[in-house]
Amino acid sequence: MYKMTTALLLGIALTGCASMKPSVHTESTFVIYDVKPATLDRNQFLKAVLDAVQTSASKLRVNREIPPTELPATPGRFELQDPFANSKMGALLASQAQNIRVPVCKNALMTVSTENTSMAQYGEQTTFFLCVLPYKDGYHIDIHATFVRANSGLTPQGISAAVGRSLIGDSSQFIPRTMNNVRAAAESVGGKVTVVDSYIPEDFKGAFVNQAESASK
């Protein structure tokens, strides 16, 4: 075990000093599911979706709205908005190459925002946003997630995190896994689920199972 760990440390050191420099890497992903039929039991459907999301959350915020009187013919779609647009704070963030955009959904039946900080000691954090948009023929489930990975460089903590990632990958692989759990939850209450659109980064593939590929089908 000692020899293997030493070899890993040497491998990390020889891979390139640039990869071990202190840095912060942010990557976003999304998937949009279409769920039919519209006659699904609404409460069972929303509960199943919520249960699937909160299993991997450290912190959770849920908003449920009153169903609309008249359903639209086509569902809406999440949008990314800059909360600091046209402000001094926005200009300051832009000058520091920090682009902060948050997902929002209009006329959503339910919105869920979560944070997963269980791997914060290794410089990793995940934010997860989900909204359920009803329409005439069913529902859309829009999911947007952001993964932040901070590299502490050649510090004991940074080296430890790098060794762990080289063995089992980082916690970004739980994002497509949660997306798949949401899909399975919708199917468990009788929903027929299809993917409308998605973007799953290659880096989000699991160490043992390609969760990214299954989330985008």
Feature-to-residue mapping (PLM):
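Mature extracytoplasmic or otherwise solvent-exposed domains
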Residues: K21, I32-Y33, L46, D51, ...
